[in-house]
Amino acid sequence: MTGQVTTVDGRVAGRRGQATRQKLLDCLGKMLGTSPYRDVRVIDVARKAGTSPATFYQYFPDVEAAVLELAEGAVRDSAALTELVAGRSWAGKAGRQTAEDLVEGFLTFWRKHDAILRVIDLGAAEGDRRFVRIRTRVQGAVVKPLAESIEGVRARGRGAEQGPSAAALAGSLVTMMAAVSSQPKSLQALGAKQAELKPSLALLVHLGVTGRKPAK
């Protein structure tokens, strides 16, 4: 947590106050992993954090405000995904490594933020523009640099010249990775082995970007 932290009434929180606020967020994050978002109450979060509802309300007006704060944390962490794509080579064995690194990084990011990402998807599906904007920012961390990579490959004559726009293709690839990341158990029930998901995603991402299978 960086920058100045203030309470709901505008006072600057001291070191202990910041620690309490962060503990409340951490406890909320854990609860979202085991309880439906709509069932989480202020009193439950406060109790888990070892404090009172009154203390919770010093830092957040309601549970939704705290959830949005957690969502912003996911947005900040998504910046690391951009680095897995921007400026990376998609040629030869380097291209294979780029695809594998992106898939590994994306799956790791999703596992870390799984609970809050599910809440973001729920809020976005219900039409809440705040969650729609947050989801767009998370996806954009990969879609934008991936679209630039596709355009670069096409400009060098290494990819398919015709076909969907780079943005549409990049968006489809990111949506595919997100869907696989969020549904591993159901895919396993359908016969997809966990160990095969990452290489399958890397293959499809590489094909989508370059139009070719990865180099062996």
Task: Identify what each model region corresponds to.
Residues 65, 69, 83-112, 166-173, ...:
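Hydrophobic alpha-helical connector segments
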Residues 27-31, 109, 145, 176:
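Short amphipathic alpha-helical elements of helix-turn-helix/winged-helix folds
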Residues 1-8, 214-216:
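Actinobacteria-biased recognition of intrinsically disordered, low-complexity terminal regions
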Residues 16-28, 45, 70-82, 146:
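Generic hydrophobic, amphipathic alpha-helix propensity
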Residues 118-121, 132, 153-202, 212-216:
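Hydrophobic/aromatic-rich alpha-helical bundle segments in the mid-to-C-terminal region
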Residues 76-82, 108-112, 119-122, 129-155, ...:
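Amphipathic alpha-helical packing segments from all-alpha helical-bundle domains
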Residues 23, 27, 31-65, 69:
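Helix-turn-helix
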Residues 32, 66-74, 120, 124:
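Alpha-helical DNA-contacting segments of helix-turn-helix folds
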